[in-house]
Amino acid sequence: MTSRNLRAFSQWSLAAAVLLFNALAASAQDLSNQSIASTTAPVMFQFVVTPDIGSIGSLSADSENNIWATALTNSVALHFNGSTWTKSAMAKASRVNKVAVISPTNVWAVGQGTNDKFSQIQRFNGSAWRVVPSPHFTNGESLNSLKAVAPNNIFAVGVSLDGLKNRLPLVEHFDGSKWNVVVVPNITGGELTDIAAISPSDIWAVGATGGATPAALTLHFNGQQWSRVSAPSASLLAVTALATNNVWAAGVQLGRGPVIEHWNGTAWKVVTSPTIDASAVLNSIRAISPNDIWAAGCNACGDVGGSNPALIEHWDGTAWSINPSPVQLGGLAANALLTFPLTKRIYVGGFAFSSFGASSFLMEGVE
């Protein structure tokens, strides 16, 4: 099972469909993206001992002493208080896709409710996780990610189904009192998988449109309305934003493997990155600075018989290169990244998969 399949193995997973087609596609084509040597020393990641929660699908923090990691399934999370990782029971859910930490008493998570047809939003108030009322569509919807611009300005993105069961991009907004559906371009087959913000009037959401050849879906919010911006063909699974003219997205191209795209303030363009197996995927991307950006995913996604390390790539301001990853029995799929610019500490979370099942893993490295 691939990392995104485990994240969203239900009817909602556009990304899972992409990976299925990808795994069946021909071997990787020559993209003229040969492996690139890094000009900086690699970060030596080490496994962090934590309770096993089956998988880590998301990481977020407001400081290095208040870190949350949520499981994709099992309705459980991990919390780090600066010295110890402990389990935290969440509200019952079929899936939790993303977590966002605002403060020790204000943490949000989005995913799917217990019946998997409808999305679920829950909040941690410092003592317990509780479900928060949110909009629902007759035919259902899914929320894949969220971004807290401020406590009273939170966006969640995903996909809904219309009366004809067509997939449509979905954005919801929390104004400090309640969640509401936001008007976005009506793009049939569209799904949003991640969101990043530079300011309240400069926000990006990325994803893909369905079909035999998925196309990139990038939406921009200027503080007033959402509009579609064209981007090279790909299924974009993650986005990180540094400045108005410096936004990065990562994902997968059908039959070709991982893709990284960059917004320079004018246009989205594919940036050369190392050649990987066609079944490899980048699930997460996070920036420390313009010359220090990290992306993570899986190498031979779904190969439960191998011992493939997690896929970790680094941008040093000039080129993308592969950073070594620890190896353990079974394959490793990274779903989540967390970076701390001041200390240059990086966390990578995901799951180890083998014929015996899946277990969560967390790695830590310091530049």
Q: Could you describe each region identified by the protein language model?
A:
Residues M1-T2, Q29:
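Initiator methionine at the very start of the polypeptide chain
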Residues Q29-E367:
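Residue-level hotspots at or immediately adjacent to binding/recognition sites across diverse folds
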Residues T2-L14:
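Bacterial N-terminal signal peptides that target proteins for export
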Residues W12-A23:
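Bacterial N-terminal signal peptides
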Residues A23-L24, D30:
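Short, low-complexity N-terminal tether/leader segments at secretion or assembly junctions of large
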